Amino acid sequence: MKKKILLLGSGELGKEFIIAAQRLGQYVIAVDFYDGAPAMQVAHEKEIINMLDGNLLDQVVKKHKPDLIVPEIEAIRTERFYEYEKQGYQIVPSAKAANFTMNRKSIRDLAAKDLKLLTAKYLYASSEKELAKATKILGFPCVVKPLMSSSGKGQSIIKSPKDISKAWEASQTKGRTSATEIIVEEFISFKSEITLLTVTQKNGKTLFCPPIGHRQERGDYQESWQPAEISEVQLKEAQRMAEAVTKELTGFGIWGVEFFLTEDQVYFSELSPRPHDTGMVTLSGTQNFNEFELHIRAILGIPIPEVTQERKGASAVILASTDGKIPEVRGLDIASEMPESDFRIFGKPITRPYRRMGIALSYSTKGEGISSLRKRAILLASKIKVD
């Protein structure tokens, strides 16, 4: 069952996915806009193109004729996926899923209006004037997001009328496309946020991984831990929502479904139809299969009977602090002295401030608490420098 996989996007998540795929004997071509991307370092072949150029994307698909097309990022001309499906290519998880989830308007309307899932109240705005009007309706604080962006790019919190102009400017210059429309959300005063990794299978039931807690800064993940603290009632509701939305989007693979938790409510936030950055905590052995192993098994149609929690774990990001090329890694000897810990250096060839260059991992088989594991992962990350 050797398949040819075209991986669109070659970051750290793609690198771990390729490693998992190769362990099952698969052949992978890694694609990205720059040479030397992490996943290219472990792929059988590579292609360097602008994936937002549909014609270039067509050429790569025609050249390689893959059995599976697996998106790893959102900055892709995903509209082409519908045509690829008509031509007989398998899109992971599906063309519909890839297109809906890259656009916050599509996925939010699907969740809130079609599936009636609980979400933050929201409005759309296509001008600074409309944004100001939306803030009057939703109140302060509120959250502004481009319809298409990732890792917090272009997002901001409006706390008062004086923030409106700056928030509008950020949404227009830091998003992923030239589209002017944005989404404006009420600010949910949540006690925590979780990622529920959800696995849809071709010939098996939908599975849920133990919930993952995470902390964000600048709109990007800084640390995650598993399992997250959540009541049984809220967990069941999150699982119900995750199953509903993934079933509607169709397809097989792993999904990172994000929720806000208040004292008594579960709010659907958004989802990614692929391995999730917060899910890298599973590399610390928290589950019988990590998220990348689950993804490749699901898309190949290999049955996954169950997902079991094996131990507790935590992750913390290792960030660059300067601009540079061919970075030097320091501190691995010191970091390696910590017990029940591990790390991954992604191999990115270029640094810039706050760019994620690796992760630190901690785990426990002796009943150690999550708080202690988080502290150890953060301490470990601080010992490693990639600049």
Curated annotation (Swiss-Prot):
GO biological process: 'de novo' IMP biosynthetic process
Positions bound to ATP: R104, K145, S150, S151, G152, K153, G154, Q155, E185, E186, F187, I188, E193
Residues where N(1)-(5-phospho-beta-D-ribosyl)glycinamide binds: E12, L13, E72, D277, K348, R355, R356
EC numbers for this chain: 6.3.1.21
Domain spans labelled ATP-grasp: 109-300
Annotated keywords: ATP-binding, Ligase, Magnesium, Metal-binding, Nucleotide-binding, Purine biosynthesis
Functional pathway: Purine metabolism; IMP biosynthesis via de novo pathway; N(2)-formyl-N(1)-(5-phospho-D-ribosyl)glycinamide from N(1)-(5-phospho-D-ribosyl)glycinamide (formate route): step 1/1
Catalytic reactions of this protein: N(1)-(5-phospho-beta-D-ribosyl)glycinamide + formate + ATP = N(2)-formyl-N(1)-(5-phospho-beta-D-ribosyl)glycinamide + ADP + phosphate + H(+)
Pfam families assigned: ATP-grasp (PF02222), PurT_C (PF21244), RS_preATP-grasp-like (PF22660)
Residues the record lists as binding Mg(2+): E258, E270
GO CC annotations, alphabetized: cytosol
Molecular functions (GO terms): ATP binding; magnesium ion binding; phosphoribosylglycinamide formyltransferase 2 activity; phosphoribosylglycinamide formyltransferase activity
Main EC class the enzyme belongs to: ligase
Subunit field text: Homodimer.
HAMAP family to which the protein is assigned, alphabetical: PurT
Stated role: Involved in the de novo purine biosynthesis. Catalyzes the transfer of formate to 5-phospho-ribosyl-glycinamide (GAR), producing 5-phospho-ribosyl-N-formylglycinamide (FGAR). Formate is provided by PurU via hydrolysis of 10-formyl-tetrahydrofolate.
Family of the protein in this entry: Belongs to the PurK/PurT family.
Protein's UniProt name: Formate-dependent phosphoribosylglycinamide formyltransferase
Organism: Leptospira borgpetersenii serovar Hardjo-bovis (strain JB197)
